[in-house]
C-alpha cells in the first residue's frame, strides 16, 4: 500500500509541466519515498538517490549507483542518466536512458567474495512509466558489446553477446493486479567458465530468443519480491547447494514467502539456434535447442508444464557410436504435473530449508502429501525423429505413493522397418538394434505405422495386452 500511495503522489507531481527548479525538491522527495518503499530497509538510500535538474520541458535525471545496496553488497560505476518528461495522465517518458558502461558489483558471502563486472559498449533505451499502474508501462533497450564477468568461490565465468534487445511491459489486470510480459533476443551469445570442480565449460549460440510472463501480480507484493531477490542473489554461488549457509536458507525462505503470489501463472520459453557445448570429455552441437516452463495454481493446486526440444544433435565421440545430426534429427518432450496443493508444498519446502533437508520427519511428510493428494503426471507431446523413423507418444500416470502408480500411454512409430535395416550398417544404431527388434515384435500394425498401447497398474505392465511384469524391477 505504501508503494501505491507514493506512486500516486509521484504521478500528481509529475503531472505538472513545464519542469521548474522550485518543484525539484518535492519531486526528489517523492522519488526517495517510492524507492525506499520498493527496495526496503536492506538498501540504504542516500538523501538524494535521484537528482533532477530542470531543462525546458523535461528534467535531466541522474541516479548515482556507487555505494552499498544491501548487506555485503557494493556497487561501483558511473551514474544512470536519462531525461524525464511528464506526460498526460501522470505518466513519465524516460528517454536517452544510459546505464553505466562499466558496472561492478561485489558481494561478501560466507564462502568468500563474488564480483560481477558488466560492460556495455553501445546502448539505446527508453521507457514509459505509469506510477499509478493505471495504464501500460514499458521498457525497450538495445545494447551492443554486452559482457558480464563473474569471479568468486569455485571459479569464474565470462558471458558475451554482440547484440542484446529487450522489451518489458506491465499492464493493468483484473482486481487491481498487473500482468508482466518480457521478451529478449541476443546474437552471438558465448559463455566460457572455468570451475574448480567441472573444469572448462564453453557454450555458444548464434541467436537466442526468450519470452516470459507473470500473470495477475499483486502490486503490493512487488517490494517483498524485489527485496527477497536482492537478499538471495549474491548468496547463490556455484557452491551454494553444497554449502547452504543459514543466511542463504533465510533468504530463500523469504523468496518462498512471496512465491505464492506468483502462482496465478508465470513462465518462460527460450529458443537457441546453432548451439555448441564443450565440457570435460564432451562436445555437443545442435541446430536448435528450446526449453520452457509454465507454473500456475488456478485452483490452489500446482500445475507445472515443461517443454524441451532439440534439432540436429551432433554428439561426436561423446555419445555411443558417434551420434550425428543426420541421425537424431528432432526430439521434443512436453511433460506436465498437477495435483499437489500449493500451500502444503511451500510449507514442506520451508521446513526443508529450515533444517537443511536433514529433518528425519521430512520423508514421512512428503509421503503423506503424495498419499493425500494424487499426483497426475502426463506427457502432452513426445516426438523423436531418429534416422528414417518418427516416434510420437502421449500418456498419463497417477501417483499415490512410491508403491501406488498407474498409467497408460500410446506410442506410435513410422519408418521403424527402415530404421532396423539401417541399424545393420550404422555403428550408432548397432547397440540399440536388439531393442528395436524387440519393440517391433511387441507392436501392432496401424496402416503404415506401428503402435504400442502401454498400461501399468497394480504392478503389472502390459504392452498391447502382453504382460511384461517380470521385466519390471521388483523390491
Set out the residue ranges of the language-model regions:
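Bacterial N-terminal signal peptides that target proteins for export
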Residues: 1-7
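Bacterial N-terminal signal peptides
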Residues: 7-15
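Sec/Tat signal peptide C-region and signal peptidase I cleavage site
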Residues: 17-21
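Glycine-rich, small/hydroxylated-residue low-complexity segments
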Residues: 22-475
